[in-house]
Amino acid sequence: MNHYLNAFLRSIIEAVTEFLPVSSTGHLFLFSSFFPFSGESLEFDDLFDIFIQSGAILSVLFLYREKFGSQMLSSFQYLTKRNSDSQGFYFLVQIVIGAFPILVVGFIAKKFLDTIKARPDLLDILASAWIFGGVLILIAEWFFQKRQGTEEKKTVGFRDAILIGIFQCVALIPGVSRSAATIVTARFLGKDTKSSAEFSFFLAVPVLLAAGIYKLIKHRSILNEVTIPILAFGFLISFLLCTLVIRLFLRYLQKHSFGVFGIYRILLGVGVLVFTKFIR
């Protein structure tokens, strides 16, 4: 397959799955298992995934530029005693608190996680994680149907940020999905669908940014006149499509729950298990 066509298809997969609770990493691995970049190393695959994830980060910063800008300005004014309003400062602190656990655990458990990703039965692990996550999403939606009439909370507090950040660590297991872990936790804490999704978006920024910087430094030796245009192409496509997907996702959540993503995960997981056990 042509490198640019491969990059285009991977960018579409990243854009559609990064902020949905379905595991973008799992989908990208599934695709690359059948359609790898011909002639390129695994390091290039890894770096390309980081570039398209960076495009996803930029889409969040672009869509929420006014919110991030005002919160950062408010934080600066609060810290320099020019403003007594602490809301912006505490918002940024919550993002840091929520991102901190997965950054620490990811660093400590890096070798173990790399071992999991190198296992020959990784597709089975992904399938199991898809099914398990799908069941959890359906349980969460059932839980909220039982709570009909109870007011859902739109504000994420410090306790919420800590708990969401802790459970986000589960997403280090391939196939679990960072979005699923954060959204499901937020829902069990009583947050409405939009607030759950948006806080998940915000948490993605420091987490994916840290991973991106680390891997860019690690794989900088493969940057050259051949690879850079492909990486830049994937970054641009991911940014443009992710911007559209986030808008459509939030519009969808105005009238629907996360249940359909739970069903999708279960069906995908079962399909992959059937393939690995009976077809491959």
Swiss-Prot record:
GO terms for molecular function: undecaprenyl-diphosphatase activity. It is a multi-pass membrane protein. Its main location: membrane. The keyword Nucleotide-binding does not apply. Keywords: Antibiotic resistance, Cell inner membrane, Cell membrane, Cell shape, Cell wall biogenesis/degradation, Hydrolase, Membrane, Peptidoglycan synthesis, Transmembrane, Transmembrane helix. The keyword Hydrolase applies. Its EC number is 3.6.1.27. It catalyses: di-trans,octa-cis-undecaprenyl diphosphate + H2O = di-trans,octa-cis-undecaprenyl phosphate + phosphate + H(+). Catalyzes the dephosphorylation of undecaprenyl diphosphate (UPP). Confers resistance to bacitracin. Belongs to the UppP family. Bacitracin is thought to be involved in the inhibition of peptidoglycan synthesis by sequestering undecaprenyl diphosphate, thereby reducing the pool of lipid carrier available. This is Undecaprenyl-diphosphatase. It comes from Leptospira borgpetersenii serovar Hardjo-bovis (strain JB197).
